[in-house]
C-alpha cells in the first residue's frame, strides 16, 4: 500500500456530480442491493453500509478514490459520513463491494477498479451486469492473497463468505438472503408492508365484529 502523503490542507470531494445510475435498470439493482444490506445490518453496532460513497484509502491524496455502488464494512460503526476516509476508520477497508455496470463502463474501468479493490484490502468484489443479469465474483482466500475469480461454473449456488448471500444463476441472476428469501426492491418491500397492514386491519375488523356479536348475544 502506498504511504500517506503529508499535506496541511487537502480537499476531499464528496461527489463527482454524476448520477447514481445511468438508467432505471441499473438504478433498480443498485437500490435493491443497498436496500437489502441496509435492512439487514441497520441495527448492528459494528457494521457500516453505504451506497455510492467516496472511499479515500490514502491520506493526503484525494486523487486516489472510488465510489462503489454498495459497500459493507465490518468492524466500523454505522452512521452518516460525507466520505469514507480510511485513516479515520482505524484503517479498516470495506470488506465487500458491489458494482452494477452501466452502458458507459469500459474494460479499462473494470480493470482499474479490480486493481484498486485488490490493492486496498477488499475481500469480496461482485460485478453485476443488470442487462444480462449476470455476475462476476472475486474473492480473497487469504488476507495477503490476490482477489481470485470465482469460475462461472461455480458461481451458481456460491455463498458470500462475509454476507451469507447466495448467488443463483440458473435463470438470470437472483440474490438470496441467508434465510433463502430473494432480494427485494423498494417497491417489493413497500407492497409487502401494505399487505401486512391490510391483513392486520382485516383481522382487527373481524375481531370487532366478533366482539359485537358476543355483546348482542349477551344482551
List the model feature ranges, each with a label.
Residues 43-55:
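A short acidic/basic microdomain associated with nuclease active sites
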Residues 22, 27-40, 48:
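A structured, charge-rich N-terminal accessory region that forms the first stable segment of a protein
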Residues 1-22, 36-39, 55-68, 73-120, ...:
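C-terminal interaction segment
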Amino acid at each position: 500500500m502506498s504511504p500517506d502523503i503529508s499535506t496541511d490542507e487537502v480537499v476531499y470531494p464528496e461527489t463527482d456530480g454524476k448520477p447514481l445510475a445511468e438508467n432505471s435498470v441499473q438504478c433498480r439493482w443498485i437500490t435493491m442491493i443497498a436496500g437489502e444490506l441496509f435492512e439487514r445490518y441497520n441495527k448492528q453496532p459494528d457494521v457500516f453500509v453505504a451506497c455510492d460513497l467516496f472511499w479515500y484509502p490514502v491520506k493526503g491524496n484525494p486523487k486516489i478514490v472510488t465510489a462503489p455502488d454498495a459497500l459493507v464494512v465490518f468492524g466500523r460503526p454505522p452512521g452518516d459520513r460525507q466520505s469514507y476516509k480510511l485513516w479515520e476508520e482505524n484503517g479498516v477497508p470495506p470488506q465487500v463491494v458491489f458494482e452494477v455496470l452501466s452502458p458507459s463502463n469500459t474494460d479499462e474501468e473494470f480493470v482499474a477498479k479490480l486493481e484498486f479493490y485488490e490493492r486496498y484490502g477488499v475481500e469480496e468484489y461482485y460485478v453485476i451486469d443488470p442487462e444480462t443479469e449476470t455476475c462476476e465474483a472475486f474473492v480473497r482466500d487469504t488476507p495477503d492473497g490476490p482477489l481470485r475469480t470465482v469460475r462461472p461454473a461455480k458461481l451458481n449456488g456460491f455463498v458470500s463468505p462475509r454476507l451469507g448471500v447466495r448467488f443463483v444463476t440458473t435463470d438470470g441472476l437472483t440474490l438470496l438472503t441467508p434465510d433463502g428469501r430473494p432480494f427485494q426492491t423498494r417497491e417489493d418491500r413497500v407492497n409487502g408492508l401494505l399487505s401486512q397492514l391490510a391483513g392486520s386491519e382485516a383481522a382487527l375488523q373481524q375481531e370487532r365484529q366478533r366482539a359485537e356479536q358476543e355483546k348482542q348475544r349477551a344482551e
